[in-house]
């Protein structure tokens, strides 16, 4: 919105030309989202408390968590407010990538909000039924995956729908002008051709998988938000490089017109995340809830797909991956041993992984900070792939 105003004024007032720089608007988006979150935080927390949006705590978990019972949840709304307002102010609203990431973010946020609402207000411990949640996640994820398959290229955005129908009529065999190769990090000009269907399937798995992985990681005060900020910032750097023809050519990346604008979204997400951390740091005044975790995870996955860094996301988000794998291993092993031995056995003391370390004697703050440190190292490894090829 401000970009439109600045472009109208820049001929008369030269200062407004600075708004044409993505880096400037990314910084301002970060600061704006941060200030909005810090200012609105007390009001949001107070309203959540008045509405009795208190988090129920598992009785079979670490005993230290029992004191958290009743802490307001659904604080992810605070993050989404900051992202929305900041992007509306600083992003180029004609950019299709901004809108698809916003749609996925707020779509998953809506799913999370319904899940939280049923858990907290209706006192239903299961929240949204697994099949219902999976249906809506699949609907949003497939929509984004199919759209991106036809738009991550230099085609006119208005042709996306037309090309989609042509692809369907061809029996999913039409060769379309879309960049669907899987880029292999640390390798110079090496990629794996996925084809249109392969791209759609991979994109869907990355978007939905990332959303659920971040949600599983959200279990301790401040645990998930810092990795989200760090990974988001790194993806913003990739977006800036691949959205710039000169930098993309120099670093041997495919040029994706318009991708650089995602740096503004990543900045807004980082600023809103820092504001949330101000109130979520131990002892937390508010929890993120599914409304925030599902939304942020979906955003990371979508951005990674757009900039073709799915494998790098897997590396940088190693904490999210480890948490998810720990749950999968625990469930599968429990079912197998129950079938063969009559009682279920566990690999971990408790899943997700952060609870395993808690029950092993680590304090909550130790788990959180150590997971942050691991994420910093993984993000640095991911960023090194910009040059080490």
Curated annotation (Swiss-Prot):
It is found in: Cell inner membrane. It comes from the Bacteria. It comes from Polynucleobacter asymbioticus (strain DSM 18221 / CIP 109841 / QLW-P1DMWA-1) (Polynucleobacter necessarius subsp. asymbioticus). This is Phospho-N-acetylmuramoyl-pentapeptide-transferase. GO terms for cellular component: plasma membrane. Its cofactor is Mg(2+). The keyword Metal-binding applies. InterPro entries: Glycosyl_transferase_4 (IPR000715), PNAcMuramoyl-5peptid_Trfase (IPR003524), PNAcMuramoyl-5peptid_Trfase_CS (IPR018480). Pathway: Cell wall biogenesis; peptidoglycan biosynthesis.
